[in-house]
Amino acid sequence: MLRTAYVNGRYVPGHLAMIHIEDRGYQFSDGVYEVCEVRDGCIIDERRHMARLARSLDELRIARPMPANSLSVVMHECLRRNRVRDGIVYLQITRGVALRDHAFPPTDTRPSVVVTARSMNFAENERIAAEGIAVITLPDNRWERVDIKSVSLLPNVLAKQAAREQGAREAWFVDREGYVTEGSSTNAWIVSREGRVITRRAERGILRGITREVLVGVLAAEGLELEERSFTAEEAYGAREAFVTSASQLVLPVVRIDDRPVGNGAPGSIATALRAKFHEHAERS
């Protein structure tokens, strides 16, 4: 239950948290966001998330509403007020409130800031990881700037719903050349028959996931070979392992793709080991 939200300079009860009807995030999806994992009251990889947030704001030419250290204070205060020890903190910044017009509003328009925090049942995540998840593949019909963490997520919503309706937990987008880009809310990985870990290069075809970034370091530390390249759905069908990564779910083994078993149909040893090692390499604040 959301006890308290931060909305434009004020901490307000969750049931009273409101935004203006002409907020550009509400009318145009003109905004960006970040979601950070929280463990033992600490924000995981806050520095990396704030760096990505700054990049997203700059790419959309949205003014920074406050310094990063002030945002950090707000996020930690939301954790305290909502009594969150293990969960997530959500931060959203939009271009602000202005008379509806597709073009940018006047330069003195103040960005809107919303921060919320909620607890999560990480024991349930562990159960899901132990069983592995199913994914489906769908044509990638998103805009090209998915490297920006925009609040405009309708294709992702439709993809996630399609997955749920087919008994899967995630959907992988596939581009026009037949290559997997990423999941609706995750980065996509496979492990080749030879044991090489493969994921698409972090370019404009995918979001540069923070968990993905940390995992690259984990792979190096563990002496595992990484190939940053595109792979097809067909290659994924024949992989030894597959998995997805995200801030709220860490590493989740994939055991079925399009109703075909991956490897022996059980969570792979590499994905399982990477999940266990993740927090040894992540930053806490």
Where do the language-model regions lie?
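Conserved alpha/beta cores of soluble small-molecule-handling proteins
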Residues: M1-W172, R176-Y179, E203, L207, ...
